[in-house]
Amino acid sequence: MKRLHPHFRWKEFVVETLVRMTGISAIFFVLLIMIFLFREAAPAFLEVPLEDLFGTRWYPIEGFYGIVPLLLGSIWVTIGAVVLSVPLGLATAVFIREIAPGWVREILKPLIEILAGIPSVVLGFLGWVVVAPLVQDWLGAPTGLTVFTGSLMLAYMALPTIISISEDAIDAVPKTYRDGALALGATHWQTIWRVVIPAARSGVLMAIMLGVGRAIGETMAVMMVTGNAATLPRGLASFQIGRASCRERVFSTV
């Protein structure tokens, strides 16, 4: 076996060291962020009693800091976005990779990736102007700024991530898997749902996790289409979050 020249071994050592230092620095910066957040947030837990912090009233100007409405509102909106985006995103990825003709795939793939780059402020404005009135008419609510509207916008924002990564995971499944299933008498749909998707399960789960992470981390669009008021949603019939008061809007802006 031919031995590597010392010059190549030295270059390999440098590259390996740089990669290792990059990974360690990423972990170090994340730890610094966590320490900074803990240091800045610790006084809040000392000044505000836990029973007030986990209360149901959020009026910071009047001294009420209950975060339960904020948590429940975020959970409701995220669950709605996941329910809407995951089935649609997976079905679209299957269509693009397994069903659509080549020329359709060449059009849809770049278009979906472009949609992922639309700023959240633009999507929030479109949701406020276009989607909210439609939801208001459909639900018969006093306003279209509802949890459902927020879920629709978050689902739209998570879809490009779920579709793109799921499509890549499905494309990575070896062609021999498909040929073997078809040779055993499986139909095209049976091959997709019982062979291809299970084989791409890890990539699909990663796509869902990244899409959900995008939905959870979004703030601006949700604030614009849900009314920016911290009130408790009380079910599908009253999915309205409501419109923030003037003082609440001023406080949230500050």
Residue ranges and their predicted role:
Residues 165-166, 170, 188-226:
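Transmembrane alpha-helices
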Residues 4-7, 80-112, 133:
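Transmembrane-helix boundary motif in ABC transporter permease subunits
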Residues 28-31, 74, 78, 82-90, ...:
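Hydrophobic positions within alpha-helical transmembrane segments of bacterial inner-membrane proteins
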Residues 113-151, 155-158:
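Generic hydrophobic transmembrane alpha-helix motif, especially the helices
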Residues 215-249:
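Glycine-rich helix-loop "coupling/hinge" segments at transmembrane-helix boundaries
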Residues 119, 184-185, 198:
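Glycine/proline-centered hinge or cleavage motifs at structural transition points of membrane proteins
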Residues 2-18, 38-81, 101-105, 249:
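Periplasmic/extracellular loop-to-transmembrane helix junction in inner-membrane transport proteins
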Residues 70, 74, 110-113, 117, ...:
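Residue-level signal for discrete positions within transmembrane alpha-helices
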